[in-house]
Every structure is written in structure tokens, then in C-alpha cells.
């Protein structure tokens, strides 16, 4: 009887030991892959924090990919927040636009960087009078938890075209960094139309064809009252921003290139934000089914953008496309001149 009990005990210990070793190997593989993918950047010199790299180890990235999510959902106690030195910071950079330029893709890709924490939702603080009236503390409380050495980034594409926004952001932080992601103006306008059209179709509502909206039927000229066209006149909106911020505080991201060659564009943004280069080609892989790049955080966690990305655009009369591109051309040239970035749009 004693022999049987000892044999049973040895068997149980063997099973438990195997499970423990397996769990340990899994943990080592996971943490090792995270460290290899995104080693923590030496951010103490960049943002003036007191921590050294030794004091700011892999745990920051682990929290960023896991526990920070719990804090974001409000599942953390005040003691946990205090224990991990977590704070809700005002953004040090904002993606201000442009709608249908790739703002969501840019935000998600920048979130690959271990020193970046993104606001998950569009907050619409500066463009919405009701939200703005709630005050800056309300806005800060909408931000995700982060370490003091990390930077928070939010995006609300309506900011770029809303008249009151530049002054409001200036009053919050006159030295903030501003990201503008743009696409070829005619393509962006058609994408804008496509999103609205899809919403109408879901509600079984009829909607005019793009050609009828973009071209004034009375004059046969481009209809600048149509919002999708007006939004694509980038230089008109940028000039309003330049009344408050110098051009050095803006960085233009090529949204068309971000689709086909994301890494070079992300590296330019890292440089603009004074971030050490941490996003690599390993973080980005092409999904042939979806037709665009997806994100690889580590060997376990991958992420593709929502299915609404990469919508099929409707066929548009080539003569209308030609007319629109001719209309946008002088505005594009001025945009290149102001920003110092030539995008070679047709």
C-alpha cells in the first residue's frame, strides 16, 4: 500500500514538474521574443526622466502590451496605479488629420513603439464645443495610463479642418508636435465618399453618385462646397494652423506610401518625435488576403486593422478624375512649398 502511494506521489510530482517546466519555457520564449522585437529605448535622456535604463526594464513593455490594457479599462486600483508610477498624460503629439488619409493606420503602427501609448478612441475634444467645455482635466482623464517617460498620442481627423481647433490646441500646449497624414487629394475624396456611401447603404438610404457631388451641374466646374473636395484642399487648412504653430512643429506623412512601404514613413515619424528607432520590418507583414500591411507585436500577438480598411472604391468617370486633379494641382504645389515635402501627385 505504501509503495503504491509513493508511486502515485512520484507520478503526480512528475506531471506537476512537467507543467511547471512547460510554463517556464513558454514564459521565457514570450519575454525573449518581446525583448528581441522591441528592446526598451534609453528614454531617460529624451524626456528628462530620473530613471536609468536599468530602472526602466522590460516590465514597461510588458505592461504596455498587457496590464496597461487593464488600467485603460478602469480595472486598476489607485494603489496599483501608484505602485507602477502610472499616469494619465496629456498628449505630446496629435495626429490632426486628414480624414481618410490613414490616421488610424498611422496611430496603430506608431503604437508598435515601446515608448508610445495611444488613445484608443477619437476623443473629439478640440473640435466639439460640448466636450471642450468640460475642460482640460476631462480631456486628460480620457488618456490611457502610461509611464511618465512614455509619450501619449491621440488622433482626431476632424481637428485639421475645424476652424477653432488650432487656437485651442495652442492654449493647451504651444510646443506640441502635430502629425498630418495625407493622400493624393482625388483618391482621398473618393475614399471619403465611399465611407459615407457605405453608411447610407447600411441604412437603406439612396445617395448621389460621386460625379454628381464633386462637379457642380450648373457650371460643370469642381464643387468646392462638397465637403470631400474641400477637405482635400490641404493648403487652405494648413494656412490656418500656421497662424499658431511654426512649420517645424508639423510632420507630413505620405499616406499613400504608408500603405505600400510603411517602414520608411514610420522611421521618419520616429525621428520627428525624437524617438530611438525601434519599429522594424519584423513588426510589419503584408497580408495578401486583405491587401495591406498588418502589425506584429511579437511571435504571439499580431493585429490587422478593421475590415473597413481597404474598401473597394466605386468606378468614377475618368474625365471627372482628370478635372479634379487639375483643380487640386496648384493647391498641391503650394502644399509642397510650405511643408518642404514633395509627394509627386498627378
From Swiss-Prot:
Subcellular localization(s) per the UniProt record: Golgi apparatus membrane
Binding site for 3'-phosphoadenylyl sulfate: 100-104, 183, 191, 293, 309-313
Role: Sulfotransferase that utilizes 3'-phospho-5'-adenylyl sulfate (PAPS) to catalyze the transfer of a sulfo group to position 3 of glucosamine residues in heparan. Catalyzes the rate limiting step in the biosynthesis of heparan sulfate (HSact). This modification is a crucial step in the biosynthesis of anticoagulant heparan sulfate as it completes the structure of the antithrombin pentasaccharide binding site. Also generates GlcUA-GlcNS or IdoUA-GlcNS and IdoUA2S-GlcNH2.
Tissues and organs where the protein is expressed, per its UniProt entry: Highly expressed in skeletal muscle and fetal brain, and also found in adult brain, spinal cord, cerebellum and colon.
GO CC annotation: Golgi membrane; membrane
Encoding gene (name): HS3ST5
Protein name: Heparan sulfate glucosamine 3-O-sulfotransferase 5
Membrane topology category: Single-pass type II membrane protein
GO biological process: heparan sulfate proteoglycan biosynthetic process; negative regulation of coagulation; protein sulfation; regulation of viral entry into host cell
InterPro entries: NST/OST, P-loop_NTPase, Sulfotransferase_dom
Membrane-crossing segments per the record: 13-32
Family: Belongs to the sulfotransferase 1 family.
Chief location of this protein within or outside the cell: Golgi
Annotated catalysed reactions: alpha-D-glucosaminyl-[heparan sulfate](n) + 3'-phosphoadenylyl sulfate = 3-sulfo-alpha-D-glucosaminyl-[heparan sulfate](n) + adenosine 3',5'-bisphosphate + H(+)
Enzyme Commission identifier(s): 2.8.2.23
Alphabetic keyword roster: Disulfide bond, Glycoprotein, Golgi apparatus, Membrane, Signal-anchor, Transferase, Transmembrane, Transmembrane helix
Glycosylation sites per record: 287
Lumenal side: 33-346
Organism, as annotated: Homo sapiens (Human)
Residue pairs linked by disulfide bridges in the UniProt entry: 294-304
SUPFAM superfamilies: P-loop containing nucleoside triphosphate hydrolases (SSF52540)
Amino acid at each position: 500500500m505504501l509503495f503504491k502511494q509513493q508511486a502515485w506521489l512520484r507520478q503526480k510530482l512528475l506531471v506537476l514538474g512537467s507543467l511547471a517546466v512547460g510554463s517556464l519555457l513558454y514564459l521565457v520564449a514570450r519575454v525573449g521574443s518581446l525583448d528581441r522585437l522591441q528592446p526598451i529605448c534609453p528614454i531617460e535622456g529624451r524626456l528628462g526622466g530620473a530613471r536609468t535604463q536599468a530602472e526602466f526594464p522590460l516590465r514597461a513593455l510588458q505592461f504596455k502590451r498587457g496590464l496597461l490594457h487593464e488600467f485603460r479599462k478602469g480595472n486598476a486600483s489607485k494603489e496599483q496605479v501608484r505602485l507602477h508610477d502610472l499616469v494619465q498624460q496629456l498628449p505630446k503629439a496629435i495626429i490632426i488629420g486628414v480624414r481618410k488619409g490613414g490616421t488610424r493606420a498611422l496611430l496603430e503602427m506608431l503604437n508598435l513603439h515601446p515608448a508610445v501609448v495611444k488613445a484608443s478612441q477619437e476623443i473629439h475634444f478640440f473640435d466639439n464645443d460640448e466636450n471642450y467645455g468640460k475642460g482640460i482635466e476631462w480631456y486628460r482623464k480620457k488618456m490611457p495610463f502610461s509611464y511618465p517617460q512614455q509619450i501619449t498620442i491621440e488622433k482626431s481627423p476632424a481637428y485639421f479642418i475645424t476652424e477653432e481647433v488650432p487656437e485651442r490646441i495652442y492654449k493647451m500646449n504651444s510646443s506640441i508636435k502635430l502629425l498630418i497624414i495625407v493622400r493624393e487629394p482625388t483618391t482621398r475624396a473618393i475614399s471619403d465618399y465611399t465611407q459615407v456611401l457605405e453608411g447610407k447603404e447600411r441604412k437603406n438610404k439612396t445617395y448621389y453618385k460621386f460625379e454628381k457631388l464633386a462637379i457642380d451641374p450648373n457650371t460643370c466646374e469642381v464643387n468646392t462646397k462638397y465637403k470631400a473636395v474641400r477637405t482635400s484642399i490641404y493648403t487652405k487648412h494648413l494656412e490656418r494652423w500656421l497662424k499658431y504653430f511654426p512649420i517645424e512643429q508639423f510632420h507630413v506623412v505620405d499616406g499613400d506610401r504608408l500603405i505600400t512601404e510603411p517602414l520608411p514613413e514610420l522611421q521618419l515619424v520616429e525621428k520627428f518625435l525624437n524617438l530611438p528607432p525601434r519599429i522594424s520590418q519584423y513588426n510589419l507583414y503584408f497580408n495578401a488576403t486583405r491587401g495591406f500591411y498588418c502589425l506584429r507585436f511579437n511571435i504571439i500577438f499580431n493585429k490587422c486593422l478593421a475590415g473597413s480598411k481597404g474598401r473597394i472604391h466605386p468606378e468614377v468617370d475618368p474625365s471627372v478624375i482628370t478635372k479634379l486633379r487639375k483643380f487640386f494641382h496648384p493647391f498641391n504645389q503650394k502644399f509642397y512649398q510650405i511643408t518642404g515635402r514633395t509627394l509627386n501627385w498627378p
